[in-house]
């Protein structure tokens, strides 16, 4: 549905911090499904951990937030703005994410009032849940 070029028109993030490769499904302001292809070339793997590369959990959370931001920032009312973390609740990591994995990230917007919102995000590798969290966000000006 959205390739990397379209994603870069919506999100301000760039390499090495753009953690969304493709959007597969989207209902603006409601629900979104995106992909992060995890490769051996990720800049964090040499240090996390040498000889045993694991994607840091905080970056899995960040990838979930970026996918969710696409659904919000695609709305005409929020176009050209930026989504910022306002909180993270109930974060759980269920499996390690390693080079070669494809993260399928599903985000459902639970609440959006003005410039403050809450979403439920889940990241899967195949059919296995890798991580989940409730993400609170604020929409700001760039």
UniProtKB/Swiss-Prot annotation:
EC identifiers of the protein: 4.2.1.59
A GO biological-process term: fatty acid biosynthetic process
Catalytic activity: a (3R)-hydroxyacyl-[ACP] = a (2E)-enoyl-[ACP] + H2O
Annotated compartments: Cytoplasm
Major localization class: cytoplasm
Keyword Kinase (UniProt): no
Active site: 48
Any Pfam family hit: FabA
Keywords assigned by UniProt, alphabetized: Cytoplasm, Lipid A biosynthesis, Lipid biosynthesis, Lipid metabolism, Lyase
GO cellular component term of the entry, any: membrane
HAMAP family: FabZ
Function: Involved in unsaturated fatty acids biosynthesis. Catalyzes the dehydration of short chain beta-hydroxyacyl-ACPs and long chain saturated and unsaturated beta-hydroxyacyl-ACPs.
PANTHER family the UniProt entry points to: 3-HYDROXYACYL-[ACYL-CARRIER-PROTEIN] DEHYDRATASE (PTHR30272:SF1)
Similarity comment text for this entry: Belongs to the thioester dehydratase family. FabZ subfamily.
Protein name: 3-hydroxyacyl-[acyl-carrier-protein] dehydratase FabZ
Native source species: Desulforamulus reducens (strain ATCC BAA-1160 / DSM 100696 / MI-1) (Desulfotomaculum reducens)
Higher taxonomy: Bacteria, Bacillati, Bacillota, Clostridia, Eubacteriales
């Amino acid at each position: 549905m959205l390739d990397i070029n379209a994603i870069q028109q919506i999100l301000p993030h760039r390499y090495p911090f753009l953690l969304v490769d493709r959007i597969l499904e989207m209902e603006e302001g409601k629900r979104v499904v995106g992909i992060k292809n995890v490769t051996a070339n990720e800049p964090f793997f040499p240090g996390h951990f040498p000889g045993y590369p694991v994607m840091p959990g905080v970056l899995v959370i960040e990838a979930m937030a970026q996918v969710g931001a696409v659904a919000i920032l695609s709305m005409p009312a929020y176009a050209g703005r930026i989504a910022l973390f306002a909180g993270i609740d109930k974060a759980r990591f269920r499996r390690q994410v390693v080079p070669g994995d494809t993260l399928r990230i599903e985000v459902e917007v639970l609440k959006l009032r003005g410039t403050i919102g809450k979403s439920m995000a889940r990241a899967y590798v195949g059919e296995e849940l890798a991580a989940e969290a409730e993400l609170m966000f604020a929409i700001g000006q760039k």
